[in-house]
Amino acid sequence: MRTEYCGQLRLSHVGQQVTLCGWVNRRRDLGSLIFIDMRDREGIVQVFFDPDRADALKLASELRNEFCIQVTGTVRARDEKNINRDMATGEIEVLASSLTIINRADVLPLDSNHVNTEEARLKYRYLDLRRPEMAQRLKTRAKITSLVRRFMDDHGFLDIETPMLTKATPEGARDYLVPSRVHKGKFYALPQSPQLFKQLLMMSGFDRYYQIVKCFRDEDLRADRQPEFTQIDVETSFMTAPQVREVMEALVRHLWLEVKGVDLGDFPVMTFAEAERRYGSDKPDLRNPMELTDVADLLRSVEFAVFAGPANDPKGRVAALCVPGGASLTRKQIDEYGNFVKIYGAKGLAYIKVNERAKGLEGINSPVAKFLNAEIIEAILDRTAAQDGDMIFFGADNKKIVADAMGALRLKVGKDLGLTDESKWAPLWVIDFPMFEDDGEGGLTAMHHPFTSPKDMTAAELKAAPENAVANAYDMVINGYEVGGGSVRIHNGDMQQTVFGILGINEEEQREKFGFLLDALKYGTPPHAGLAFGLDRLTMLLTGTDNIRDVIAFPKTTAAACLMTEAPSFANPAALAELSIQVVKKAENN
C-alpha cells in the first residue's frame, strides 16, 4: 500500500512519485489549496492538494485530524522561503494526485493542542502512541534491544528462554500467583527474575546466557517501577566479577555510542562504603559536585547534644554538606529544606551561612554558632573548603538517617540551585555491598538476594560473623539511577545452606523451597556470576524522560491497573469454581 514512509522523504526523492499511508496530523484549508501534515511512525511530511487535481482537493476538504489515509503524489523541493528547518522533511513537500480515506476518526478524546492528563493518555494509549515523541521512544527501545542481541551474540552468549510459570521463592517482593486447574489448591508464581533458572543453566554447561525477559513483582509502585518490567538478564560461568563488569560495561558503552553518539569512557569503581560516606547514597549522581564531609571528630566535646550525641556514638554520624553559593538561600527556603529532611527521619537541619570568612564569627550566620567556638567553626570551614557566599548544612543522627537525609538533600539542592550538570553522563560501578542488613526485627535479610556469594569468607567464618560479610556484588549506576546489578553466585552447597540459615530459613523450608537448587549444587557446579539490567530504565535514560511509563507501550498505573483494558477485572464465577477458588468478602465494620 505504501512505497515510502512519510518521515523518510528527503531532497533525494524530488521528482519521484510516492505512495504514503498514515494519519492526518494537522489540516490547513486555504480555499484553493489544502495543506496537511501527514504522519506515520517515521515522522511527518507536508502534503498539499491543488485545483489541478480537483477530485483529490474535494476529498481533502473532508479530512480531519487522525483520519487514516493513503496519498499518492510527487515529491517537490520547497522554495527557499518555505523551508521548515524544524522538520526533518522540511525541505520537501508532496503534491497529491490521489487521496483515499481508509478510515475516518470520531471526535478525539485526546487534545493534540493541549497537555492531556496521564490518566487520559493511558486510557486511550493507542492514540497517545501516535504522537511523534512517543513513537520515537518506542523506536529507540527497539533499537536498544536489537543492539543488545547483536552484541551478546558477537560475544558468545546464547539467548535461552526460562519458564514463566514457576515456583514461589522468597526474592524480596510478593509474587503474582497463578492457580493450577490440574493441581487443585496449588499455585504457580510468575517469576520476579530468572535468577535460579539462569544459575541452573550454568550448572548445565551453558556458560554464557542472556535473555530479554519479562519479570513480575507485586510491590508498592513508584514513578520508576512497574508490576511487570523487562530485564536484560545475563549469567556467565568461569568469569570473575571484574571480567563480568568489563563485558557489561562494554555493552552499555556500545549502547550509548550507537544511540546517543556519546563515548562514556571507562567507568570509575567505588565501594558501597565510600559512596555512602561521600554521597549518602549507594547510587550516587556524580554530575552533582557536592559531597558529604564527616565532622564528628570536631564536635565531640561541644555542649550541644544534637551534635555531641551522634559524634560520640559509634553508630552515629555528623556530616556537613557545603553548598556553593548557598548563602543566598532565604529563611523560607532553608525551612523548606528542614522539612524535606524530616521525610527521611532527620529531626531538623542545622546550618552555617558563610558571608565573609575573614571576619570570623561576625562573618557567619548560624543558629548553632552559640554552641560552637571560633576554633571549631574555623575547622569546619576549612574541612568543607567553604568560601564566602556558601552554606553548610549539617546532618546529625544515626548513620542511616544521616546518609538518607543528607543524600536526598544533596540531590534536591543540586537540582534546585542548578549545581547538577544536566548535560553530562556520569556512570560508575558500586561494589562491596554489605551482604546482609538489619530486617528491623532483630534478624538479617539479604541486601541483594540469598544466592549472592560473600567476598573472601568461608562458610564457617560467615556463620560466625555474618554482620561483617561483604557481598561479591556490583551495581552499575548512571546519573543517580541504578541501571543494573549483579553478583558472583554461591556455587557451594554448604555456603548456600549457611546463608539460608542466617536468613532464618530452616532446613525443612530449605528443602521445600530450594531442594532442586541444593541438589544441583552437589554435581560439579562451576563458579558463576551475572547481572541484570532494567531495560525500561535504560531506555528512560537514553530517551531523556523521567517517567518509566513513557518507554513502555502499554504500562500500568501506580495502582498496578491498566486503564485501557480495565485490568485487573473480576473473574467468571464458573472459572473460579473450576480452579477451586472462592472469593471471600471481608465483613464491613459496623
Curated annotation (Swiss-Prot):
Region (Aspartate), start-end ranges: 195-198
Family as reported in the entry's similarity comment: Belongs to the class-II aminoacyl-tRNA synthetase family. Type 1 subfamily.
GO-annotated biological processes: aspartyl-tRNA aminoacylation
Main localization of the protein described in the UniProt heading: cytoplasm
Signal peptide start and end residues: none
Organism: Escherichia coli O157:H7
Residue numbers binding L-aspartate: E171, R217, H448, R489
GO molecular function: aspartate-tRNA ligase activity; ATP binding; nucleic acid binding
Keywords: Aminoacyl-tRNA synthetase, ATP-binding, Cytoplasm, Ligase, Nucleotide-binding, Protein biosynthesis
Tagged with keyword Cell membrane: no
Catalyzed chemical reaction(s): tRNA(Asp) + L-aspartate + ATP = L-aspartyl-tRNA(Asp) + AMP + diphosphate
Localization, UniProt: Cytoplasm
UniProt cross-references to InterPro entries, sorted A to Z: Aa-tRNA-synt_II, aa-tRNA-synth_II, aa-tRNA-synth_II/BPL/LPL, Asp-tRNA-ligase_1, Asp-tRNA-ligase_1_N, Asp/Asn-tRNA-synth_IIb, AspRS_core, GAD-like_sf
Quaternary structure (record): Homodimer.
EC number: 6.1.1.12
CDD domains in alphabetical order: AspRS_core (cd00777), EcAspRS_like_N (cd04317)
Origin: domain of life: Bacteria
Function in brief: Catalyzes the attachment of L-aspartate to tRNA(Asp) in a two-step reaction: L-aspartate is first activated by ATP to form Asp-AMP and then transferred to the acceptor end of tRNA(Asp).
Name listed for the protein in its UniProt record: Aspartate--tRNA ligase
Cellular component annotations (GO), alphabetically ordered: cytoplasm
